[in-house]
């Protein structure tokens, strides 16, 4: 059963919009839909065309992979200790709780591991919801991808933010990290993030989880929050719990209390997990699958 759950999670979290995908300096607006009120219209086509947040009270509505975001806030593209990447995606939107969390976390990074700051990947679309490419989650404004590459001690150009690749920490055989790229600084950052009370989970590649299990010393309780899943070899994924004032937000069940470093982790390196059979494509999600409040979010001016 756990193997089946893990395979399902792979589909929930992975997708083509990974940190190493290039962006564009000249993003083209999407053409209008011929019949946006058609019940069969994929929800991603509707939310993917929303270019500004819904001017409503901040609320995360629904579940991480089946919901939307009211009153989203933009993480500024530049901060003292962060820079937003792939600006052409317009995915630097989040619940104000996530934006505040990233600002506070980034300010601590130089003390945590000596990096100048964080390179921030995808958060959510302006109104959350399903995305045209990539992530099945990131719909509530409570998920954020952080590159496994230190922020340079300078401002990146727009072209660099669209074209440079993140650092792949995982060996080609996917069995462990690349010792030439994985550093104690990665462990220190992931440990600091997982210890934050607001953080519900931190998703990393199984090979990175294996390295953390091997190298962590002292208090290891934080390892329970670090969950393995495929992808996530160029970035790690922060997930916050439902914030106050979001009564329609549904949190995940707490992760198991164990470190997740024994047989539970070993399963990820079996042939069935390393070489899974392709699954059948799922039909795209429509608005009927989302909470009714998401219609109000889309309809807001």
Predicted feature residues:
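Solvent-exposed N-terminal domain segments of exported/luminal and surface proteins
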Residues: 22-58
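Active-site acidic/histidine clusters and adjacent loop/turn architecture
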Residues: 52-120, 182-189, 196-199
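Sec/Tat signal peptide C-region and signal peptidase I cleavage site
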Residues: 15-19
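Hydrophobic helical h-region of N-terminal Sec-dependent signal peptides
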Residues: 8-9, 13
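Envelope-exposed proteins and targeting segments
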Residues: 114-119, 140-144, 198, 232-236
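Bacterial N-terminal signal peptides that target proteins for export
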Residues: 1-7
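Extended, low-complexity, intrinsically disordered C-terminal regulatory tails
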Residues: 101-133, 203-225
């Amino acid at each position: 059963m756990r193997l089946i759950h893990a395979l399902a999670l792979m589909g929930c979290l992975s997708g083509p919009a990974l940190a190493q995908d290039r962006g564009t300096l000249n993003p083209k607006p999407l053409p209008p839909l011929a019949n946006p009120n058609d019940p069969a219209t994929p929800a991603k086509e509707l939310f993917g065309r929303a270019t500004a947040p819904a001017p409503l009270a901040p609320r995360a509505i629904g579940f991480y992979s089946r919901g939307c975001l009211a009153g989203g806030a933009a993480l500024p593209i530049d901060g003292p200790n962060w820079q937003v990447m792939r600006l052409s995606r317009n995915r630097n939107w989040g619940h104000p709780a996530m934006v505040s969390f990233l600002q506070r976390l980034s300010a601590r990074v130089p003390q945590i591991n000596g990096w100048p700051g964080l390179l921030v990947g995808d958060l959510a679309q302006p109104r959350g919801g399903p995305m045209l490419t990539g992530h099945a989650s990131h719909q509530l404004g409570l998920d954020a991808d952080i590159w496994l590459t230190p922020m340079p001690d300078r401002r990146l150009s727009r072209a660099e933010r669209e074209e440079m690749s993140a650092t792949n920490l995982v060996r080609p055989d996917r069995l462990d990290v690349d010792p030439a790229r994985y550093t104690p600084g990665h462990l220190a950052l992931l440990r600091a993030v997982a210890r934050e009370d607001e953080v519900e989970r931190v998703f990393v590649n199984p090979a990175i989880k294996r390295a953390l299990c091997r190298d962590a010393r002292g208090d290891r309780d934080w390892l329970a929050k670090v969950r393995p899943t495929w992808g996530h070899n160029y970035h790690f994924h922060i997930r916050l719990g439902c914030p106050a004032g979001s009564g329609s937000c549904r949190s995940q069940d707490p992760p198991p209390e164990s470190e997740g470093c024994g047989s539970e982790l070993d399963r990820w390196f079996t042939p069935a997990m390393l070489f899974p059979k392709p699954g059948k494509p799922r039909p795209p999600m429509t608005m009927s699958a989302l909470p009714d409040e998401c219609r109000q979010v889309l309809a807001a001016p």
